[in-house]
Amino acid sequence: MTDEPISERAARHVAAFNDSVRSGDWADFASRFTPDATMRFVGVPAGPFTGREAIADGYAAQPPSDTLTVTRAASSGDVDQLWFAWDSGTGTGTMTVRWSSALISELTVGFD
């Protein structure tokens, strides 16, 4: 993977995340995942979650309170690697997003 501008699919994912943070509605965000998707967090006591419904329930139970901005991106095939900063300035992290067609099949989020 090489650094490059954020892919359109990853930009849509981040926009959907930020919209859900603002609205508190995680159903639309969860619809971006395959029915059997997995989501893991590294560095926080949450998950892992398997399945679209479990992902939506996980976000609803422990919703993020801050939006994020991608600071660096790299893509290779069906994988986008994103580095991000919380907009409040409280930290940074990474997202590895694996795609199956236009839906997310696997999401791993790590916190620095």
Per-segment meaning from a language model:
Residues 1-27, 31, 35, 103:
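Short, low-complexity N-terminal intrinsically disordered segments enriched in polar/charged residues
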